[in-house]
């Protein structure tokens, strides 16, 4: 994948949901012990992080549905904490870019409502923290991820 989901978590959720069928996730489920804990860090105002966090969490809590995974009960009942990063930087305006600074707050607000109903509201996490900063400072180049974000 050259770029993320450029502010479209609905697309990201379809793609990232395939992770539950991967060998890596099955290996993780098999290696998970009863005393293990999980801590997930994600962003909330774009597409990839906003989609990835709920999907990963859902797949962990639905671990009994993973075939050939021995420790899926431990995984399903694991204590999970998370840190979600709110908008914290400024980007240059570029009308041709799919990423627009003016959309950050609206996308964050929509994601927060979704998280309230589908993550904290149903006790999928034991603790959820938010961190962010005033993002009005110097503007970074507007890059959807295939060039500048890899520096």
State where each predicted segment sits:
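Tubulin/FtsZ superfamily GTPase core signature
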Residues: 1-151
């Amino acid at each position: 994948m050259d770029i993320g989901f450029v502010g479209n978590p609905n697309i990201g959720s379809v793609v990232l949901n395939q992770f539950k069928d991967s060998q890596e996730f099955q290996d993780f489920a098999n290696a998970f012990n009863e005393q293990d804990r999980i801590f997930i860090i994600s962003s909330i105002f774009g597409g990839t992080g906003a989609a990835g966090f709920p999907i990963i969490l859902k797949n962990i809590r639905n671990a009994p549905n993973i075939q050939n995974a021995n420790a899926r009960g431990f995984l399903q009942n694991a204590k999970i904490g998370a840190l979600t990063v709110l908008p914290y930087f400024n980007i240059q305006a570029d009308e041709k870019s799919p990423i627009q600074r003016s959309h950050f707050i609206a996308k964050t607000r929509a994601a927060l409502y979704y998280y309230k109903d589908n993550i904290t509201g149903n006790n999928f996490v034991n603790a959820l923290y938010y961190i962010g900063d005033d993002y009005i400072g110097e503007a970074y180049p507007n890059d959807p991820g295939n060039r500048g974000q890899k520096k």
